[in-house]
Amino acid sequence: MRTFTLIWFGQLVSTIGSYITDFALTLWAWEMTGSATALALVGFFSQLARMPITLVAGLIVDRFNRQRLMMLGDGVAALATVGIALLYLADSLHIWHLYAAATLNGGFGQVQSLAYQTSISTLVPPSQLTRANSMNSAVHYGAAIFGPALAGVLYPLVGLLGIAGIDLVTFGAAIATLLLCHIPQPPPRAEADLETRFAKLTFGFREVWRQPSLRSLLLITTVFWFFHDFGGAVYNPMILARSGGSAAALASAAAAAGIGGVTGAIFLSIWGGPKRRFKVMLAGFIGAGLSKTVFGLGRSPAIWMPAQFCSSLNFPLLGSAETALWMQAIAPEKQGRVFAANSLVLQGMSVISALVAGPLADRLLEPAAVTDGWSSTGLGVIFGTESGAGMAFLYVGCALAMMGVGIGGLFRSKPQQI
């Protein structure tokens, strides 16, 4: 457990640094473009790079040294940060450079993440796995609390160049902890022939398709995450537009999300998890959608922070219930391939939502929000007519759709049979 804790600490520090940089780059991109599309495309290129890697990441991690793969992922991310810093220093940084960096980080980050996840079972005894997984949840939510808050304070003081320097130091901490530790490799498996390897790539899809209850579960979760990511694509630009580009407003919302997630995870660990998992997952869908609806209707941090806290409170609950359903329905030796297939489907939906949401907001909804027709229908009263109103309309629409998925799922009998 000591070795895992040291590596975990390095990953926590590195993730906080990444959140600081991502936050600063979001502010820089908004200052340069004022475009929801520009921000959404960063997520698009990151997810686009992950999709083909997801198909083969399991084979890569099983074949090559996982410790070196983790260092490779951190090293590539550090090089991307150096590249951005040099371009900024030369006054040559453009928005498309962020897309290139997102593509690079997305692909290598997928391998790095899987190498880290699959190393846990070789570092931690079975009795400590639950504790280790709880610590991993803290990496994301803890970074979500501290990263944006630090960036909101540091960005006005040290600028993008200073933020990049801090990020490089955190990458160094992650790589140093890996160099100080030894991660045992699992026993090598017999090499499969080429045909078998290609068959493995489609096994997860075939396994889900074979069982009607799993098909229905995947459909429900895919539709939910599609609307979640569709609204999420305009989340940052909506806050920045509504707040006049305030870094403090964006940081406060991000911190509230982290606190809500940590609170939900702590509650879940004390409770021990639900028994009627499918209905609890749907309740999480409804709760998240309701909270996001309130968030989208708000126009200041006074509304955004409590609404975001309540929204994030639901995700550890719905996420754990969904994962438990899959684990309950799929044999352990098949779970990796099935989870990879599910991940690929969700990534595809995320790519589509990121590609469509930004242009829809910029070219249709934001211009429509300043027309007389917008006010005459009552939308002006609900969402306002200032900058960000069109994005708020889109965000609330997606939140209501998330609620609809949760309510509609109550009438689906097949997933309840799992």
PLM regions: where:
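Structural signature of transmembrane alpha-helices in multi-pass secondary transporters
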Residues: 14-15, 46, 136-140, 257, ...
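Cytoplasmic helix-loop-helix junction between adjacent transmembrane helices
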Residues: 101-144, 148
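Helix-loop junctions on the cytosolic side of multi-pass membrane transporters
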Residues: 91, 118, 122, 164-195, ...
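Juxtamembrane intracellular "pre-TM" segments in multi-pass secondary transporters
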Residues: 1-4, 183-219
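Helix-loop-helix hairpin linking two adjacent transmembrane segments in secondary transporters
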Residues: 90, 140-177
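C-terminal transmembrane bundle of multi-pass solute transporters/carriers
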Residues: 42, 52-56, 63, 69, ...
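Small-residue hotspots at the loop-to-helix junctions and early N-terminal turns
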Residues: 21-24, 28, 33-43, 134, ...
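Short hydrophobic/alpha-helical segments at membrane-entry points of transmembrane helices
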Residues: 6-7, 93-101, 216-217, 302-308
